[in-house]
């Protein structure tokens, strides 16, 4: 089971430098904001100023045995995430997404999320903005799951053949008490888009399913399967295929 909920609403914002006295939650008049948000743009005459922004939000939690993870698509620049006054994680780069596992920090009922964003200049050759400039999501998942960005694909064409060997590596996370958390991994290959071929005026569709049993518990699972004569991408038809991996236990998607 996995649920992904957008948390772009319900935030409050305050721009204020921090010190040892107000390291986590400074006093001040917070203003309501909706993400994505750039606070540097408020002062167009001073777009490269050193500054610190604070974002806070309430989050309700009902214990159900699932992990809770905050997924940030982008914060500029250096950030730290607090849950109920405790630091849950930091991220020191403004141009990539990241996640923070807050499972051990949340409590039943109402919780407070606080994100501190530190912007220091000079840092770019262009206007970067500052703040939580992309969406934020709450992910609810089982303790056993495919890790974020944990699916790696390497297609290798056989010499003098139209057959391709698709090498897949899956990185899985397991709960501490899971001896054999799932029975198999199901791989599903489908055509994602680019169905119309300008040269032949034909539609193409593909759905291939592979089921691979697993042996001993591991963090990395590797499988290889073959595909014959896939339609390749070219300038006339942007063929694109999608591979989805699912963890299967007792015939059901985990």
Specify the residue positions occupied by each region the protein language model found.
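Accessory beta-strand-rich segments of carbohydrate-active enzymes
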Residues: 3-18, 33, 45-149, 175
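Glycan-recognition and processing domains
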Residues: 23-37, 126
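Extended acidic/polar, glycine-enriched regions
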Residues: 107-110, 171-254
């Amino acid at each position: 089971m996995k649920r992904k909920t957008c948390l772009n609403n319900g935030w409050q914002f305050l721009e204020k430098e921090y010190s040892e006295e107000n390291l986590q939650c400074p006093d001040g008049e917070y203003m309501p904001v909706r993400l994505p948000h750039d606070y540097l743009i408020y002062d167009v005459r001073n777009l490269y100023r050193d500054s610190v922004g604070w974002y806070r939000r309430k989050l309700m939690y009902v214990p159900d045995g699932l992990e809770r993870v905050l997924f940030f698509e982008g914060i500029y620049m250096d950030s730290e995430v607090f849950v109920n006054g405790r630091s849950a994680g930091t991220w020191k780069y403004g141009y990539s997404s990241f996640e923070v596992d807050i499972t051990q920090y949340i409590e039943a009922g109402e919780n407070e999320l606080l994100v501190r964003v530190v912007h220091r200049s000079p840092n770019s050759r262009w206007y970067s903005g500052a703040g939580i400039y992309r969406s934020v999501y709450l992910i609810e998942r089982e303790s056993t799951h495919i890790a974020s960005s944990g699916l790696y694909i390497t297609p290798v064409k056989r010499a003098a053949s139209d057959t391709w060997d698709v090498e897949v590596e899956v990185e899985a996370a397991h709960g501490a008490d899971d001896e054999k958390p799932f029975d198999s991994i199901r791989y599903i290959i489908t055509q994602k888009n680019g169905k119309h071929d300008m040269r032949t005026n034909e539609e193409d569709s593909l759905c291939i399913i592979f089921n691979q049993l697993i042996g001993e518990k591991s963090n990395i699972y590797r499988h290889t399967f073959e595909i014959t004569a896939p339609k390749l991408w070219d300038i006339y038809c942007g063929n694109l295929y999608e591979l989805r991996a699912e963890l299967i236990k007792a015939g059901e998607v985990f």
